């Protein structure tokens, strides 16, 4: 639905009922799979808006998207950490309430240059409602942050493209109970890229340099598996 065409405002709503059969790996992967897995079923509700407009001539666009959703999931299939290895398991009943917000814009500059920027934020409360007598009842699911987001900035010239990106993830829990001893700290990772594309005769070249984790942040995505510190890489592509 588009109630105000001149403002480029779209409103949408959705309901769907989904059914997911466990994959072959979910069932039989060595030490990880579980042959007792039940199919995952969910009722999903979503409502959202998208607004887009150019506020002045140099601005190509300004876009804002907001989506809110509620998912009621039965027998949710998850990878569940155990003492020595991970196992696939069903959560009997899970409710997921979430909000996604995305903002993006771009500007045209003189001399064939442009700048684009984007940012996204996700709020997701995914709680276990399986057993009211369990110590993890109404606790956040393992490895599911309540808050996460990212941002990116790209400056493009006829000669080179410079990019900066940032990813932020809030605290998580690596076991079912949301207690301090099970907490994994949140983190922010920043990356920088420099790239150039050019053509020589009929051959296209692309060279890209990346500086990853600029701040040399030490963090875990999975408990006890630390991610690398600051690193760099160079990638070259040739197309004939």
Model-found features: residue ranges?
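Flexible, solvent-exposed coil segments and beta strand-coil junctions
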Residues: 22-32, 77-85, 128-134, 169-176, ...
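Gram-negative outer-membrane beta-barrel transporters
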Residues: 57-72, 89-174, 202-204, 215
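A generic beta-sheet turn/junction motif
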Residues: 4-6, 17, 155-159, 198-202, ...
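Residues that define the transmembrane beta-barrel architecture of outer-membrane proteins
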Residues: 41-45, 70, 95-99, 143-149, ...
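Extracellular loop and loop/strand-boundary signature of outer-membrane beta-barrel proteins
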Residues: 30-37, 84-91, 133-140, 177-182, ...
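Residues on the lipid-exposed face of transmembrane beta-strands in outer-membrane beta-barrel proteins
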Residues: 1-2, 47-51, 101-105, 119, ...
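C-terminal beta-signal and adjacent terminal beta-strands/loops
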Residues: 69, 74, 108, 115, ...
């Amino acid at each position: 639905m588009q109630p105000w065409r001149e403002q480029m405002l779209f409103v949408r709503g959705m309901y769907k009922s989904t059914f997911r059969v466990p994959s072959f790996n979910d069932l039989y992967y060595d030490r990880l799979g579980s042959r007792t897995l039940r199919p995952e079923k969910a009722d999903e509700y979503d409502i959202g808006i998208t607004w887009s407009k150019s506020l002045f001539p140099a601005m190509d666009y300004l876009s804002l998207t907001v989506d809110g959703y509620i998912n009621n999931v039965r027998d949710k299939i998850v990878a569940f950490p155990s003492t020595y290895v991970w196992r696939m398991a069903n959560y009997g009943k899970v409710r997921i309430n979430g909000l996604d917000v995305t903002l993006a814009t771009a500007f045209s500059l003189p001399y064939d240059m442009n700048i684009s920027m984007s940012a996204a934020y996700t709020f997701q409360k995914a709680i276990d409602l399986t057993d009211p007598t369990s110590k993890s009842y109404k606790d956040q699911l393992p490895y599911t942050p309540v808050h996460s987001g990212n941002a990116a900035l790209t400056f493009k010239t006829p000669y080179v493209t410079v990019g900066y990106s940032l990813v932020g993830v809030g605290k998580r829990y690596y076991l079912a109970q949301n207690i301090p001893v099970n907490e994994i700290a949140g983190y922010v990772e920043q990356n920088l890229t420099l790239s150039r594309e050019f053509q020589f005769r009929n051959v296209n070249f692309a060279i890209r340099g990346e500086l990853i984790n600029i701040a040399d942040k030490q963090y875990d995505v999975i408990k006890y598996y630390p991610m690398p510190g600051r690193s760099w890489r160079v990638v070259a592509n040739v197309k004939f």
